Amino acid sequence: MAQPLILGVSGASGLIYAVRAIKHLLAADYTIELVASRASYQVWQAEQNIQMPGEPSAQAEFWRSQAGVEKGGKLICHRWGDVGATIASGSYRCAGMVVLPCSMSTVAKLAVGMSSDLLERAADVQIKEGKPLVVVPRETPLSLIHLRNLTSLAEAGVRIVPAIPAWYHQPQSVEDLVDFVVARALDQLAIDCVPLQRWQGGMEGE
């Protein structure tokens, strides 16, 4: 059985990325340990005009409803302030962690080793333990400070997967564009659960 995947949802705009990741992971029967930052609650209100529950079991039902997956896999939600959770420990065994989407505030804190909540602590643990950590920044334009922070993370072994879609798979919907980014993020953990038309070659240079 595959090890659990930690999914961090920060306060960056673009919660649809997290929703689509949950949809595909649960459909493939993965176990997800999810922690949403305090700011992500405000983003749900701003993007969808809905309120995300804070209680873990209710929040798990909320995410399943948003993803349209009633059954399959296992989704465990943690409170953002629960720094004593299992995923806050280096002894917790997992396949890795993806922060999707990842705010520049989260990037900055991780770059200097600061952790003020469970999301940041879990990500910091991945770095110190040498476990896979993927961050998906969704910010533009990027300042020099942003770039330096991302460079620091890359130098520490973190995989940086910007939320930039491709077009060669001829996307027909917003979901197609989002799924490409989700697939590329999960590729970094050798997880292949997103139906995706991958590049087949055939375009010749002039």
From Swiss-Prot:
EC number(s) stated in the UniProt entry for this protein: 2.5.1.129
Keywords of this entry: Flavoprotein, FMN, Prenyltransferase, Transferase
Gene3D superfamilies with a match to the protein in the record: Flavin prenyltransferase-like
PANTHER family to which the protein is assigned, alphabetical: FLAVIN PRENYLTRANSFERASE, FLAVIN PRENYLTRANSFERASE PAD1, MITOCHONDRIAL
NCBIfam families in the record: PRK06029.1, ubiX_pad
HAMAP family linked to this entry: ubiX_pad (MF_01984)
Annotated protein name in UniProt: Flavin prenyltransferase UbiX
Organism: Synechocystis sp. (strain ATCC 27184 / PCC 6803 / Kazusa)
Gene field: ubiX
